[in-house]
Every structure is written in structure tokens, then in C-alpha cells.
């Protein structure tokens, strides 16, 4: 077992020392409705319309900012309804993925909290609104054929350029 004091990651940087990077999380949003024939939409609850409202409200949230790393961006990267394709059907389910760029000090709880608070507010305002937020789960196959899985949450990191480690590299 090796326990190194330091690690250097050889990533494209134009030979510049990078002392930090935003992390990344994939947030899974789900909205739930009630299927109906699209000729009688009043008999259903359109999960896509509920998702549109949720995304519109999420866009109003102010992401945290780090002096060196920038904004903790949150952007919709995909959206799909069910049934899909939904010929003549009011969709009863909708799923969207958010790409959330993470800053140092952010935790799983602190990232999901504002999203869950927003969902709770929308559910209170609209009795037909039903949604949940969680982290996407990634599944990967190892060289041994074993399958591993975990939440897609990769923290940001930052080292002060004045730290000994960085000064030794620059020296």
C-alpha cells in the first residue's frame, strides 16, 4: 500500500500549475403527474409542465462563488418524459439532469438543500406538484467484471499557491 505525501496529476494545462478545480455533481430531478389522453388534458397532470416550472424556478437560484474557481454553475443537460414517445398522452413522469459545478466546502447536503427547499415550496403552492431531487448514480464495470456504483458527486478542490507543496513544485 502506497501513501504518498503528494500527487501530481498530468492533465492538459499548458504546463501551468493548476491549484484548484471545480467539482461536479449530477442532480436527478423527477416530476410526477397523471397520465391522460391529450384530447382531454384536464383529466391528467402534465409532468413536463411541472418540470418546466421547477427548472424555471431553479434558474432564479444564485450559485455560490469562489474567488479563484468562479461560480458553482447549475445547468440542465437533458430532459425526457414518460411515456416516450408520448403520442396523444399527457406525460405522467419527467426526468431531467442538472450538471452542477461544485466549489470547495460544498457537501452533498448543501448542494441538494436549496433544490429540495424549492420543491417543498412548489408542492405547498400547487397541490398537483410532486417532485424529488437526488444525485444520479453511476455504474461502472471493473477489469475483474465486478460492477461498482456510486453517486455522481465529485468535490471541488483548491490549494493556496503559498502552500509549501505548491512552492516546491514552482521552485
Regions from the PLM with identified roles:
Residues 28-171:
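Metal-dependent amide/peptide-bond hydrolase catalytic core
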Amino acid at each position: 500500500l502506497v501513501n504518498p505525501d503528494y500527487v501530481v496529476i498530468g492533465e492538459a494545462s499548458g504546463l501551468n500549475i493548476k491549484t484548484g478545480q471545480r467539482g461536479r455533481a449530477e442532480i436527478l430531478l423527477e416530476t410526477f403527474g397523471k397520465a391522460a389522453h391529450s384530447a382531454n388534458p384536464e383529466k391528467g397532470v402534465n409532468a413536463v409542465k411541472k418540470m418546466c416550472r421547477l427548472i424555471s424556478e431553479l434558474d432564479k437560484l444564485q450559485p455560490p462563488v469562489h474567488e479563484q474557481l468562479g461560480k458553482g454553475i447549475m445547468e440542465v443537460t437533458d430532459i425526457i418524459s414518460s411515456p416516450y414517445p408520448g403520442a396523444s398522452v399527457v406525460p405522467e413522469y419527467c426526468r431531467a439532469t442538472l450538471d452542477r459545478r461544485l466549489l470547495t466546502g460544498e457537501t452533498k447536503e448543501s448542494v441538494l438543500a436549496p433544490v429540495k427547499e424549492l420543491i417543498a415550496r412548489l408542492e405547498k403552492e400547487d397541490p398537483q406538484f410532486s417532485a424529488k431531487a437526488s444525485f444520479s448514480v453511476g455504474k461502472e464495470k471493473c477489469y475483474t467484471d465486478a460492477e461498482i456504483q456510486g453517486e455522481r458527486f465529485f468535490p471541488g478542490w483548491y490549494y493556496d499557491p503559498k502552500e509549501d507543496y505548491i512552492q516546491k513544485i514552482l521552485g
